[in-house]
Amino acid sequence: MAAELSMGPELPTSPLAMEYVNDFDLLKFDVKKEPLGRAERPGRPCTRLQPAGSVSSTPLSTPCSSVPSSPSFSPTEQKTHLEDLYWMASNYQQMNPEALNLTPEDAVEALIGSHPVPQPLQSFDGFRSAHHHHHHHHPHPHHGYPGAGVTHDELGPHAHPHHHHHHQASPPPSSAASPAQQLPTSHPGPGPHAAAAATAAGSNGSVEDRFSDDQLVSMSVRELNRHLRGFTKDEVIRLKQKRRTLKNRGYAQSCRYKRVQQKHHLENEKTQLIQQVEQLKQEVSRLARERDAYKVKCEKLANSGFREAGSTSDSPSSPEFFL
């Protein structure tokens, strides 16, 4: 039977081989079941192991019979589909034969390849993936079975294929720990922005010496931010505080200057108004003197004319005579 199982991955197509596979009966393989109480009690390690290069048709009578035996070949032989199906059927009967309703005839049909894989096999694949996931979270669940002291090296390279596959997929602890050890050294120096800022500060000197007071006051905020690219945050904050102080000082000086100018303007206007008032007063006094002079003259003329009219009223040459 080992010679038949050592065939290549391609199944034979000759009628003789197909007839042999059809006559192959898996019902004669019985599995010895251990009671539940004995399965829960820790047992001693197995003393009898399956010899390499042979396929076990019946479970061993040792305490390891609760663990389904797997076919193991020499390292040079390639694992075939027959080995997968045999291990899958044996593991399925050991775990729970009534759970998926899988019969040996289904395994034979899947082996022949004339029909697609039945639904119970697909269900078993899901159950096996869940079983692998359970073993992933609990890496030592088989310690409760008898003969749990047997290591992976004693059982051979094909004893637990799913565990072997899982260990190949997972990275080794040394490789997982090496990035963590390299993390502190991944950033040996400051970032590129800090380096650029240090270079700009070292080449151009202090940022306060780069701009004059007039430039800081007259420069807009957007233009200042464009010139401050590459400097450190402390230098930018200090320069903006200086700019704010200069602008406040300039605003205060401007207000003071405006107040002084307004004061001078008001004083000049006051002086001019006082002078105008004095001029108006002088003009009023002059007009008052002229008024008085004209009044005196008018009175004199009135008195002199009355006397002349009284003396010439009877003569015919006077105007009043003809009237």
From Swiss-Prot:
Positions with biased composition (Basic residues): 129-143, 159-168
Region feature (Disordered): 34-78, 116-209
Bias (Low complexity): 54-76, 175-203
Biased composition (Basic and acidic residues): 34-43
Pfam assignment, any one: bZIP_Maf
Positions bearing the Glycyl lysine isopeptide (Lys-Gly) (interchain with G-Cter in SUMO) cross-link: 32, 297
Molecular function as annotated in GO: DNA binding; DNA-binding transcription activator activity, RNA polymerase II-specific; DNA-binding transcription factor activity, RNA polymerase II-specific; identical protein binding; protein-containing complex binding; RNA polymerase II cis-regulatory region sequence-specific DNA binding; sequence-specific DNA binding; sequence-specific double-stranded DNA binding
Region (Leucine-zipper): 266-287
Domain bZIP: residue ranges: 238-301
Record note on modification: Sumoylated. Sumoylation on Lys-32 and Lys-297 stimulates its transcriptional repression activity and promotes macrophage differentiation from myeloid progenitors.
Keyword set, alphabetical order: Activator, DNA-binding, Isopeptide bond, Nucleus, Proto-oncogene, Repressor, Transcription, Transcription regulation, Tumor suppressor, Ubl conjugation
Predominant cellular place of this UniProt entry's protein: nucleus
GO cellular component, one term: transcription regulator complex
Transcription regulation in keyword set: yes
Tissue expression profile of the protein: Expressed at low levels in a variety of tissues, including liver, muscle and spleen. Strongly expressed in hypertrophic chondrocytes of the femur epiphysis, while expression is very weak in immature proliferating chondrocytes (at protein level).
Quaternary data: Homodimer or heterodimer with other bHLH-Zip transcription factors. Forms homodimers and heterodimers with FOS, FOSB and FOSL2, but not with JUN proteins (JUN, JUNB and JUND). Binds DNA as a homodimer or a heterodimer. Interacts with the intracellular cytoplasmic domain of LRP1 (LRPICD); the interaction results in a moderate reduction of MAFB transcriptional potential. Interacts with PAX6; the interaction is direct. Interacts with ETS1 and LRP1.
Functional summary from the UniProt entry: Acts as a transcriptional activator or repressor. Plays a pivotal role in regulating lineage-specific hematopoiesis by repressing ETS1-mediated transcription of erythroid-specific genes in myeloid cells. Required for monocytic, macrophage, osteoclast, podocyte and islet beta cell differentiation. Involved in renal tubule survival and F4/80 maturation. Activates the insulin and glucagon promoters. Together with PAX6, transactivates weakly the glucagon gene promoter through the G1 element. SUMO modification controls its transcriptional activity and ability to specify macrophage fate.
Domain-related comment: The leucine-zipper domain is involved in the interaction with LRPICD.
Protein name from the UniProt record: Transcription factor MafB
Organism from which the protein derives: Rattus norvegicus
Gene: Mafb
